[in-house]
């Protein structure tokens, strides 16, 4: 079975384009970006994952006490994932 990374190798490495200017993305890992608002505050993280049906975007927040990420939601659209981190 062919993985999505083999079909679209550059797709997972590019920074997702956001339609809104309220936040921007700073790379934090291979498939991970920090979501930063206009004031420079980190709202959370956006992780790109491969799904058999296409690219999915996970909105996550770092839980400092445990050192792990907490899933906020998983979306088909990067803007929807970023919007979930605004609240």
Where are each of the predicted segments found?
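Negatively charged, low-complexity tracts enriched in Asp/Glu with abundant Ser/Thr
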Residues: 1-39, 65-70
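Short aromatic-glycine-(Arg/Gly/Cys) micro-motifs in beta-strand/loop hairpins
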Residues: 43-68
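A generic structural signal for ordered secondary structure
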Residues: 32, 46, 77-78
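A short, charged, amphipathic alpha-helix used as a generic interaction element across diverse proteins
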Residues: 63-68, 73-87
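Well-ordered beta-strand positions in beta-sheet-rich domains
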Residues: 22, 45, 72-74
């Amino acid at each position: 079975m062919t993985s999505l990374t083999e079909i679209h190798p550059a797709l997972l490495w590019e920074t997702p384009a956001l339609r809104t200017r309220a936040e921007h993305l700073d790379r934090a890992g291979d498939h991970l970006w920090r979501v930063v608002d206009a004031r420079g505050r980190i709202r959370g993280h956006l992780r790109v994952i491969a799904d058999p049906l296409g690219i999915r975007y996970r909105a996550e927040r770092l839980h400092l006490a445990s050192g792990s990420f907490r899933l906020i939601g998983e979306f088909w659209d990067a803007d929807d994932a970023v919007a979930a981190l605004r609240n």
